[in-house]
Amino acid sequence: MSKLRFFQSLLISTVICFFLPSINARGGHSDHIHPGDGNYSFHGIVRHLFAQEEPTPSLELTRGYMTNDDLEKAMKDFTKRCSKISRLYSIGKSVNGFPLWVIEISDRPGEIEAEPAFKYIGNVHGDEPVGRELLLRLANWICDNYKKDPLAQMIVENVHLHIMPSLNPDGFSIRKRNNANNVDLNRDFPDQFFPFNDDLNLRQPETKAIMTWLRDIRFTASATLHGGALVANFPWDGTEDKRKYYYACPDDETFRFLARIYSKSHRNMSLSKEFEEGITNGASWYPIYGGMQDWNYIYGGCFELTLEISDNKWPKASELSTIWDYNRKSMLNLVASLVKTGVHGRIFSLDKGKPLPGLVVVKGINYTVKAHQTYADYHRLLVPGQKYEVTASSPGYKSKTTTVWLGENAVTADFILIPETSSRGNQLRSSCDCSCKSCGQPLLTQFFTETNNGITLTLFVVVVFLCFLLQRRVRFNLWKQRQSSRRSITV
């Protein structure tokens, strides 16, 4: 009977595998850093190049730009016009009480899905307003084209895109870099090298709103839009000794890849004579501390770029259409990169068949990606054209490792983890009495030579049949994913 119970256990495990939740982690068309840990903070150290006081833009120059009220109305009008693929929400308020509005674009806005999330933030500095104008144009372009343009459709169906045109509405209203408390918001985040000011309550309301936002939503990647140069900037932004030199983060290759996506899609960013390929490591350009970019990567688990998208901080409004034309393709391709490449998947427990929030690491890269709490989906951005050893783990379960060759298209790698002490293992042990001479025989041989042959054979046939159905299901999923050029692996 103990052997019969073993096969019953085997049958149950197979059924669980067969009926695993059918939600796929979408994100693809064919000491260790643990993001989210720690609570360091700091008050900013001046980044000399753009932190210098500059003349306030004239009132004449601001004509043609949306006021804060204009922007709010435009965002509300947008979500009414495009209600099927968008929603409007606020993550908090500025010092002067203006809502920090965000537009979410997705085929299922407001719902939790096993998809990567991307955020764009504009107007971090009040006197750099181009981003707020371009981000609203981006939202409208996607709304107008997602039914007819493949790239727009890909983004709507496979990504949750969050667009915040203005993080610093107070600074914009007075045409100044800093917020209403005269604090540079891009120097107000926790920093890995200078953890001064550990009191969260001493941070600016805009900063706290961003930090809370990233606790609520697990973003895969992000970009902030700035003005005053033409370059895609990536981590690290600072160095431990405050000197200026190239200081690479663990995912340096991936960040360079993402930065090149933007610069090479841009009309002329990659042609820069100052920055090779139109990209730069922040610390090699000029170090800053307390920046949003590094904080996103360390504490938020989010790959963020700082995009300088116009040589002039506050160009004439008549130039906005040209700047939009130069940046539109770059902005779209950067978001689409989340689903075009990388390794994506979900983690399950074998014993219960449920999503298992865990950790994913890649050998040789000192960085950990966390799977989402709800669907246990993960989205690991990596450079195409390389082989990676990917490991999934979760407390109380045996880790699993697989080798992935990442070509030009994304790969799905789902992991099914076995408990450290599984019920099946206990049944195996209980079925073997050390005083029994036959314990050395193969288990299946024992079954087929004892009196339970008929029942055992029936169970065996059922298990084989379910495995056959499971293989067909996997092949069908692979066929569907191949239609979008995505490979799939189950480990």
Curated annotation (Swiss-Prot):
TM stretches of this protein: 453-470
Cytoplasmic topological domain: 471-491
Highest taxon in the source lineage: Eukaryota
Pfam families, per database record: Peptidase_M14 (PF00246)
Active-site residues per Swiss-Prot or TrEMBL entry: 308 (proton donor/acceptor)
EC number per UniProt: 3.4.17.-
Signal sequence interval, chain numbering: 1-25
GO biological process: proteolysis
Molecular function GO labels: metallocarboxypeptidase activity; zinc ion binding
CDD domains: M14_CP_plant (cd18172), Peptidase_M14NE-CP-C_like (cd11308)
Extracellular side of membrane: 26-452
Glycosylation site residues: 39, 268
Topological type in the membrane: Single-pass type I membrane protein
PANTHER family documented for this protein: CARBOXYPEPTIDASE D, B, PROTEASE M14 CARBOXYPEPTIDASE
Family from the record: Belongs to the peptidase M14 family.
Protein name: Carboxypeptidase SOL1
Organism: Arabidopsis thaliana (Mouse-ear cress)
Source taxonomy: Eukaryota, Viridiplantae, Streptophyta, Embryophyta, Tracheophyta
The encoding gene: SOL1
